Structures are given as structure tokens and as C-alpha cells.
Amino acid sequence: MLILLRLSEVCVNFVIIIGIPLLIEASILCIQNILELLLKGIGILKFNRYLHTIILRLFFLSFYMLHFPITLSILAFQLPLNLLTLSQASFHLPRSHMILYQQQECY
């Protein structure tokens, strides 16, 4: 009984850890949509994807900062981890998450 209780506790903790970033991302997207509607309503929305670009950059930067040791062990396993700095390790990050959107002006 105690083993099942511990196992369910581990599963719940795992679900909470996985669910928190998704909840944060959903709330950020809601705030982004509200801000875009307000800006569009008063007519000063100049950059269509600018806010989305900033949020994506911050989200993926925080993701890699939180998972930095895991990312380093996967991507640079042949190098000692204590010799790598963040600027050296950022070279090894996947390029698919570093796509920058071109800013477009709406007239």
C-alpha cells in the first residue's frame, strides 16, 4: 500500500512539473491576445508579430535556462560541463527554436 501511495505521489508530482510550463504558456498567450485586441481597438498596433516574437524568445530562453544541465549533457556530452559557459553552450542550441520573425509595419 505504501509503495502504491509513493508511486502515485511521484506521478502527481511529475504531472504538476509538466503542467506548470503549459499553464504559464497558456496564460501568456491569453494576455498577449488581450493586449493585441486592446491595441488594435485604439489603432496603434504597428507590429503584428512583435509581441509574439518576444514571448517566444523569453519562453525558450527560460526553458533552456531551467534545463541547462540536461541540455549540456545531451548536446555536449564529450566536454566537461564545468568548463562550458552559457555563451559557449548557446552555440549548441537547436536552431529551430531561435527563429526570428520579420517585423512588418501595418499602415
Curated annotation (Swiss-Prot):
| Membrane protein topology class | Multi-pass membrane protein
Q: Which residues cross the membrane?
A: 11-31, 58-78
Q: What induces it?
A: Down-regulated in the absence of SIT4.
Localization terms from the record: Mitochondrion membrane
Question: What is the top-level taxon of the source organism?
Answer: Eukaryota
Where it mainly occurs, coarsely classed, is mitochondrion
Q: Keywords in UniProt for this one?
A: Membrane, Mitochondrion, Transmembrane, Transmembrane helix
A GO cellular component annotation here is: mitochondrial membrane
Its protein name is Uncharacterized protein YER181C, mitochondrial
**What species was this sequence derived from?**
Saccharomyces cerevisiae (strain ATCC 204508 / S288c) (Baker's yeast)
